[in-house]
Amino acid sequence: EFLFKKNKVTYFKGIGSFKSANKISILDDKKKETVIETEKTVISTGSVPVSLPGIEFDEKIIVSSTGALALDAVPKKMVVVGGGYIGLEMGSVWSRLGAEVHVVEFLENITPGMDREVSTEFMKILKKQGINFHMQTKVEGIKKSAKAATISTSNKDGKKVNFDCDVVLISVGRKPNT
């Protein structure tokens, strides 16, 4: 909202519907309707974290990036599933706060879409921070108990490895609210 105000953009929050090409009805949380006329409209629907098939976020042991920001304490051991920007940022924060962090990534490199050389250098920096990487490794399942989880994985050679941890951060992408 700050950036909207700073850039002189009018911000409305609510349920919107187009009355015509340039008229929009906005119903706020108090059911008050506001009708606005506009030349240009930006619709920002937001997004939600994507999980792995059959695995649900509980935001305590199996967390999304939102849950990772709200943890009550620094976990002893965290496994980050996914080597993209969001998971690496969260993993880096928790590592610097004292957690042992392992990143499990299905692909060969972290930060898909980034220049390979930059990605390689970025990974070196994160390793110096103490983050452990398990590349070309597939998550096959997660078993959760009351206070921990075990992640079952297999690497590109078929070797099976289990990771025990206090928190699993699943950071494999986001899906738009459409």
Question: Where are the model-predicted features located?
Answer:
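A Rossmann-like FAD-binding core segment of flavoenzymes
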Residues: 10-13, 17-29, 97-178
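Alpha-helical transmembrane segments of multi-pass membrane transport proteins
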Residues: 10-13, 34, 71-72, 86, ...
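Structural detector for helix-capping/boundary residues
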Residues: 14, 39-40, 60, 66, ...
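Glycine-rich dinucleotide-binding loop and its adjacent helix/turn
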Residues: 45-99, 104
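Glycine-/small-residue-rich beta->alpha transition segments that form the dinucleotide
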Residues: 38-40, 44-50, 66-68, 165-178
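Glycine/serine-rich phosphate-binding loop and adjoining beta1-alpha1 elements at the start
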Residues: 19-21, 27-28, 32-61
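Helical element adjacent to the flavin cofactor pocket in flavoenzyme catalytic cores
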Residues: 1-11, 39, 45-49, 122-133
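Structural signature of beta-strand start/N-cap positions in the alpha/beta core
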Residues: 34, 39-40, 77-79, 100, ...
